[in-house]
């Protein structure tokens, strides 16, 4: 997969090169890495460490998975962009915010066709959802560690998508035109 399409091993390139079924497998595996590190590994480490806040340990474990995915030693430190793994991490930390961010991403793809833009918009919307969802759901406010993480995450996503941003500026970014269900059809 690294020799075709964009050369990235992430779900978007797998979709473009191999189709939706292999891309779904990649997305599930990437998401599982983030979810597992937060939901399963972090509590194990929390019991063995002196850090008094499980949320901090969860974020550290999850972000370690994201960094391992993004800068994998198995591919010369050139991995994916981290969106799927961050999504799995968010699913474990704050499932309702995950669903809202996913909705932002899907709507962005439907209206623009740009997956990179969807990833950026979803990440930028996260701190807003982390802040406004608890009162609507009748739950406690998000812990400070999660709020800080949600404010920093968009910078990471923008960093990993810097080449896509340049392609967007140059009008060279690939679109998923089939996903753009509201676009005008070309008439021949």
Regions found by a protein language model. Give the residues of each.
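Cytosolic, membrane-interface loops and tails of multi-pass inner-membrane proteins
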Residues: 1-23, 166-188
